[in-house]
């Protein structure tokens, strides 16, 4: 394939969380507003951008592999940019490791991206956009290029002040800073006017949101977004148990547009390990929050979580406490990971007493344990009729892919005479269940 000679073309690859993917939508919008055109491969691009994740070492190494893989393209005049958490964490050291990189920019500097693009175009080298964690500014732009015409993100809070012992996010994303409720609601209305019906509010700790004017709590903001005409579903992620309050559950229970799904990372079922992690809650306090969600009057909430296994000092007994917590809560999904040492974090000072092989063993046990819980949970949906939003067609299986308000995938068949529209809502009868998805048939 011929290499594009147009320097104002770009390719972007995104690693990591929803925050990164939404940041990339804003970066893409800014690039397009500056006259750039997006292309599908590195080979066709004049500017190659990697929006990076550093939450675990494996994610961090992916970007350096990409930079090495395509290094020879610099000889053809292509420019490289490293964005996001690895950029903020490693800073100018990236230039030493990958001298062909022209721009290193953390997420807090994206508001200056247009100016940095001018520097790239003028031939400048080693351009940096690195803010300290004390910045009060958030990245708001009218140039968001949303990748989905029906489901979209709104970042309501950036940064993190929790400083968990294992986590690099406070050092790469800066301190917590919230957008005004007025700004969030304005963006939500614009999305509704543009045809979006499913809106997800984002933050590293989304429920730590504090309206700078003091007008709205997080629960009140959720409700206000859900009351906007045209919006059918409101989601939010990720929550921190420390700031998870009962009024959030009450809002979900009483407002059908607020999705009946909460992702509440626990990280460990052992109070001792949680204390070493600096999570600032106990097993019992976490389970109190679960009890609020189990006690709803109008809706049954789906609960998912994150778990780290093999944290320094975690004993077999403490690991078994985590397995017991899974049994107690009956999560609909668990994102589980082996502990990975990260730069600048307090846990680096701990003696990593759990061998890598043992971490892998525990992870496998936990995943298999949770898989059986999910298998039983998903089977309970058989015979139910559930509303889905149509996301895509799976032509090879003669099925359509839908998503429920509980964020579950429901693959379904339709009569030959029916052609659902992407983004439309339909009633589906569940006929089969698997540990990670449901299967059904269109009934309305």
UniProtKB/Swiss-Prot annotation:
EC number: 2.8.4.3
Domain named Radical SAM core: residues: 146-376
Cofactor binding remark: Binds 2 [4Fe-4S] clusters. One cluster is coordinated with 3 cysteines and an exchangeable S-adenosyl-L-methionine.
Residues the record lists as binding [4Fe-4S] cluster 2: 160, 164, 167
Alphabetized UniProt keyword annotations: 4Fe-4S, Cytoplasm, Iron, Iron-sulfur, Metal-binding, S-adenosyl-L-methionine, Transferase, tRNA processing
A GO MF term: 4 iron, 4 sulfur cluster binding
Cystine bridges: none
Major location category of this protein: cytoplasm
Top-rank EC class of the record's enzyme: transferase
Catalytic reactions on record: N(6)-dimethylallyladenosine(37) in tRNA + (sulfur carrier)-SH + AH2 + 2 S-adenosyl-L-methionine = 2-methylsulfanyl-N(6)-dimethylallyladenosine(37) in tRNA + (sulfur carrier)-H + 5'-deoxyadenosine + L-methionine + A + S-adenosyl-L-homocysteine + 2 H(+)
Record domain MTTase N-terminal: where: 8-122
PROSITE patterns reported in the protein's UniProt record: MTTASE_N (PS51449), MTTASE_RADICAL (PS01278), RADICAL_SAM (PS51918), TRAM (PS50926)
Keyword DNA-binding: no
NCBIfam families assigned to the protein according to its UniProt record, in alphabetical order: miaB-methiolase (TIGR01574), MiaB/RimO family radical SAM methylthiotransferase (TIGR00089)
Family per record: Belongs to the methylthiotransferase family. MiaB subfamily.
Self-association state and partner proteins as the record states: Monomer.
Function as written in the Swiss-Prot or TrEMBL entry: Catalyzes the methylthiolation of N6-(dimethylallyl)adenosine (i(6)A), leading to the formation of 2-methylthio-N6-(dimethylallyl)adenosine (ms(2)i(6)A) at position 37 in tRNAs that read codons beginning with uridine.
Name listed for the protein in its UniProt record: tRNA-2-methylthio-N(6)-dimethylallyladenosine synthase
